[in-house]
Design a protein with these regions (language model features):
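Conserved anion/nucleotide-ligand pocket segment
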Residues: 97-161
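ATP/nucleoside-binding phosphotransfer catalytic cores, i.e., glycine-rich phosphate-binding loops
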Residues: 214-278
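Internal helical hairpin/lid segments
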Residues: 170-226
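ATP/NTP phosphate-donor binding region
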Residues: 1-47
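N-terminal glycine-rich "phosphate-gripper" loop used for MgATP/nucleotide binding
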Residues: 50-61, 82
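Conserved beta-alpha junction segments in alpha/beta enzyme cores
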Residues: 2-4, 149-185
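Short, acidic/small-residue loops that bind anionic groups at enzyme active sites
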Residues: 67-91, 99-106, 237-241
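Short Gly/Thr/Asp-enriched flexible loops that form oxyanion-binding sites at enzyme active sites
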Residues: 56-74, 90-93, 225-228
Length: 278
């Protein structure tokens, strides 16, 4: 965390730490009531312009419906994070109509993230210009790319959290572009179950398109990779799909807005997203 604070201060930001940022409660980073207190204190503080998660946010789904959505809407701040922080970001988009930033500059101490990610985060935090991303052949999900063009609000992030919040916290994604990424928590069957649940529940009805990022650390099982599982499930949805995006849990992952207008051009292999900075 010290390195993260140092880098942000070098970039010109003033950094304040939440009262409970170093807490522990079992496998969680503090008690639910303390974590939600830190978040809501930040939402009502007019000097705070962004809230940056220091890690992935285990258990964020326990507190996502307790956010002060009125305060967040009245004085929007960018929540920066990924993994389980996705459910916080989607709740803010749905209930306060504010965008967030998917990605983080804050894990330098364990070597997971790079200078590329850090610079991408600074750009997303400070620039009002659209962000342009290109599908990369060395990201295995690039083979999922189909054809066509789609536009709408880019919504999503970590697949596990999208499924966790579906229906009870986040409504259907009519007319929007779904973005998914994930990292291995269990076997391929877990991804199959997640995608099947979204399909069978009707959650993905009338979506405009799908953007697919990194699915990292998954093993091959009986000749199938995680990309094979995704291809099998996504084949049931007749919308443009753009894979191979450098977004997620992999090294050099970029940072993009969630909850702003986006365009995917599968033929050109590009994703363009309006800035979250207003």
């Amino acid at each position: 965390m010290e390195k993260t604070v140092e880098l942000l201060e070098q970039a010109g930001f003033r950094v304040d730490l939440g009262k409970h940022v170093l807490d522990r409660h079992g496998y969680l980073a503090g008690r639910d009531e303390d974590r939600i207190s830190d978040l809501n204190d930040a939402f009502v503080d007019s000097e705070v312009r962004a809230i940056i998660a220091t890690r992935g946010g285990k258990g964020a789904y326990r507190i996502a419906d307790a956010l002060d959505f009125a305060a967040a809407h009245n004085d929007p701040k960018l929540v920066v994070g990924f993994s389980e922080i996705t459910i916080i970001q989607l709740a803010l988009w749905q209930h306060a109509n504010i965008p967030s930033l998917h990605g983080t500059p804050s894990a330098f101490y364990d070597g997971l993230l790079s200078e590329t990610t850090y610079r991408a985060c600074l750009t997303a935090l400070s620039s009002g210009e659209p962000l342009h991303l290109r599908s990369m052949e060395d990201v295995p999900t690039s083979s999922l790319t189909t054809s066509g063009r789609a536009e709408g609000i880019l919504v999503g992030g970590n697949l596990d959290m999208i499924v966790t919040g579906a229906d009870w916290l986040i409504p259907k994604l009519n007319g929007n572009i779904l973005f998914i990424e994930d990292v291995k928590k269990a076997g391929l069957g877990h991804i199959d179950r997640q995608m099947t649940r979204l399909l069978k529940s009707g959650y993905l009805e009338n979506i405009a398109g799908i953007a697919v990022g990194q699915f990292t650390n998954f093993d091959t099982t009986d000749g199938w990779s995680v990309v094979d599982v995704l291809r099998d499930r996504l084949a049931l949805i007749d919308v443009p799909i753009l894979g191979g995006l450098p977004l997620g849990h992999g090294r050099d992952a970029l940072v993009i807005p969630i909850g702003t207008h986006a365009v995917i051009d599968a033929d050109e292999g590009t994703l363009t997203v309006e800035a979250a900075v207003r």
